Amino acid sequence: MSWFTPEVIDVILTVVRAIVVLLAVVVCGALLSFVERRLLGWWQDRYGPNRVGPFGMFQIAADMLKMFFKEDWNPPFVDRMIFTLAPVVAMSALLIAFVVIPITPLWGVADLNIGLLFFFAMAGLSVYAVLFAGWSSNNKYALLGSLRASAQTVSYEVFLGLALMGVVVQVGSFNMRDIVEYQANNLWFIIPQFFGFCTFFIAGVAVTHRHPFDQPEAEQELADGYHIEYAGMKWGMFFVGEYIGIILISALLVTLFFGGWHGPFGILPQVPFLWFALKTAFFIMLFILLRASIPRPRYDQVMDFSWKFCLPLTLINLLVTAAVVLYNTPAVAAQ
C-alpha cells in the first residue's frame, strides 16, 4: 500500500505552499525597509542609503549582518520568558494570518470558509505581544508604550471588523475566494463600499502602528516605546513584523476591495499574480507616503478620531449596506 495517497499529497502540497508563502513574506518584509528608506529619500529630495553596493542595494544585507551579530542581551530586571516570547508572538501571528489570503486562483495556503474570522483571530494576538513586551521589560516607558499600543489596537480593530461587515453582507460569505470571485462578476468593492474601504485603510494604518498612528513608539515622549529594552534578533523580529503587517493590510485591501488577482475590466487575466503584486505594491507605497507627508497627532486626538469619526462612519455604512441588500432580496425580508 502506497503512503502517497491523495490526502497525503494534498497535505504535502499545502505545507510546501505555506513554507514558500511565509518565506516570501519574511524576505519582502526585510527588503521593504530598504525600499522605504530609498523612497523617503527620493520624496524628501535627499540621499537615501547609497554607500553599500550599487545604489545602496546591499544596505539591507549589511543591516541584517549587523543585527545577526549584535549581542542578544537580556537586561537583568526583565521577565526572561515573557520578554523572549513577545517578539515571537508579534511576528508569528502576522505570518499565520497570511495563510488565508488567496494570491492567485491556484496559489493560496488555506481556503477557509471563515477566512476573515481567522484573520481577526490572528491579528488580535498582536495585542498580547505588545502587552507582554511592555510588562516584561520592567521599564516605565515600555509599559506606557504598550498600554498606548494595546488601547489603540483594540479600538481600531473594532472598526477594522465593522468596515468589512459591509463586504460580508453583500457577498454572504467570510471566504476570501468567494469575495474575490464576487468582484470578478460585479463592481470592485472600492465603489459600493467606499466608506468601508476608507475606514479599513485608516484602521489598518493604526493597527500596524505606522505613522501617523505611531504614538506607542513616539521617540520624543516614550523613547521608542514598548521595545526600548530589546536588541539584536528580538528587536529585529519586532522591526520585520511591522513591515509584515504593512504587507498583510495591503494584501487584504487588494483582496477585499480591489478585486484580488483580477485586473480592471478583465484585462490580462493570464497574469493574476502580476495584478495582485502591483496592487499590493501600490498600497505599500501609500503607507510609506503617509510617513513622508503627514505629521504625528497627539494620542488623545488619535483615540477621539477613532470613536467619534470611525465608529459612526462604519455603522452608517453597515446599516445602509444591509438596507440595500434587504431591499434587493424581498423574499428574505418577507420571511
UniProtKB/Swiss-Prot annotation:
PANTHER family named among the record's database cross-references: NADH DEHYDROGENASE SUBUNIT 1, NADH-UBIQUINONE OXIDOREDUCTASE CHAIN 1
One Pfam family named in its UniProt record: NADHdh
InterPro entries: NADH_UbQ_OxRdtase_su1/FPO, NADH_UbQ_OxRdtase_su1_CS
Keyword vocabulary terms for this entry: Cell inner membrane, Cell membrane, Membrane, NAD, Quinone, Translocase, Transmembrane, Transmembrane helix, Ubiquinone
Species per Swiss-Prot/TrEMBL record: Pseudomonas entomophila (strain L48)
Gene this protein is translated from: nuoH
Top-level division of the source organism's lineage: Bacteria
Subcellular location: Cell inner membrane
Protein name, UniProt field: NADH-quinone oxidoreductase subunit H
UniProt keyword Cell division, yes or no: no
